[in-house]
Amino acid sequence: MLILGVMNLRNELINETELRKALSIVQNGLFEIRALKKNPKRTLSGYFRDVDTAVNALMSDKIDLRGFNVYMSLNEITPECYDRSQKDRMIIPEVTTNDDVITSYKWLFVDLDPVRPTDLSTTDAQLGKAKSMAKRILAYLKGIGFEDPVVAMSGNGIHLLYRIALVNNSDNEALIQKCLQALSLMFSDDDVKVDTA
């Protein structure tokens, strides 16, 4: 899932224009937006078919997203998910997206995380190292035939999103996992790790 940030949208930590742009780039039809909070533990979820409805739900005065990590699904999910109770709104869900409702993989998600103690934000120096690694990975993958990715900054690292089109099955899931493991073996170091989860 693509992280949209830790935010309170009404306090403008994330600009509405930038939120619209991010959602427009990666949304694939039906998508889920999920918001997680550690203390106290709480989850909100919404299913959306269009950017305007999603942005309106996130900007609503009816929800307070202070302290939440907000992210969206990247893979294609079954249309039946839209019939869930959180259709076109952010609420405490009974159920959220899991592997069983993913029909296909639309993005290879390369997540670069600086090594740091848990619950500490990334420093500018650590983020610089993640950006440097992202450039090396981008050059390597371009050299073997990948198109340019969508590049985004997460709350504490860098995301590289490569367009793919793979049916969700065990072989393709293993292929993606092996790809991430290979990138980790080639590029992870003491300062920045390629997330293989």
PLM feature spans:
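C-terminal polymerase-core module
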Residues: 192-197
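Signature for HUH/AEP ssDNA processing cores
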Residues: 2-156, 163-188
